[in-house]
Each structure stands twice: as structure tokens, then as C-alpha cells.
Amino acid sequence: MKTLTALARQGVALFLLLAFAGGVSAADTRVGPVTHLPLPRYVSLKTAEGNVRRGPSLTHRIDWVFKRRDMPLEITAEHGHWRRVQDRDGAGGWVHYALLSGARTVLIEDDMTPVHSRPDPNAPIVAAFELGVVARLGDCTDSWCRISAGGYRGWVPKSTLWGVAPDELRD
């Protein structure tokens, strides 16, 4: 009887441990119910114009129109063929998935951001990008990202970009 009680306690302890551990990992990893991709995540606008609707269907009112091809957007929710997105300023709504691309772009957040030849603040500067420039996103280390725009390519501090998560690594 004593052995059965000890085994029962161990079983309960193991159950609680697994239940707690499972809850932690589920809270840390949020995925979209449609694509099973991480939420939030960044994408870009595939077209020159994209209607932003109040809800996830064609019957919902168009609140405004995004008018910048390749503009980075953050997906915060999914519903069927619709994605709730927001831009750098937090403006957003629901956009049909066909208007979005997985090609990653970023927005330059600081005026005249120096673009370096290597991920090093002492590396030669190959260009300077103005505030609001949209650039293609390449590799990212813990604090630098490689970007390209207007025929120029180089590295900028990740903190000068919108459209990439602070802890995101890319290669």
C-alpha cells in the first residue's frame, strides 16, 4: 500500500510538472490558427494599393488604403483568407492575404542612417538612407541587419529599423 501511494504521488507530481511546462511553452509560442506561422510576424505589401478593412470580409467597410508597395507590415491575427495587420504607426485593419508577401522589408527609422560595409560601427560607410526608406531585409545578427535599397547594400544597427523583431536572427 505504501508503494502504491508513493507511485501515485510521483505520478501526480509528474502530471503537474508536464502540465505546467506545457502551459509555459504554449504561452511563449503563439501561432496563427490558419497558417500555423508565428504571431506576430512581419510581411510586406505585395501590391501598390491594399484596402484595409474594419473586419475580415469584403462586406466590412474600407477604412483606408495602404499605397506603398513593399511597405513592411506586422500580422497580428488571422481569420480565413484575412490577416489583421498594422504599420509602423500602429494603423491597421484587415487585409486579404493575396495582397501580402512573405518577402521581408524594413522601414528606416532614423534620418540619414549610415549603411556600413560590415556589421561594425567602425566599418566604412557605403551609403546613408533617409528616414522612411523601405529596404529589403537580408541577414540579421543580434544587433545588426544587412539591407539593400536603391542599388546600395550594407549593414545598419537593428535599432534603426522597423519591420524586424529585436531578438530576430536571420541568415
Please annotate each region the language model reported.
Residues 61-62:
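Beta-strand-rich domains and repeat architectures in extracellular enzymes and scaffolds
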Residues 20-22:
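N-terminal signal peptide c-region/cleavage motif recognized by signal peptidases
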Residues 13-14, 24-25:
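Cleavable N-terminal signal peptides
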Residues 26-54, 65-69, 76-79, 86-91, ...:
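SH3-family beta-barrel domains
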Residues 57:
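Intrinsically disordered, low-complexity polar regions and short flexible loop motifs
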Residues 1-12:
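Bacterial N-terminal signal peptides that target proteins for export
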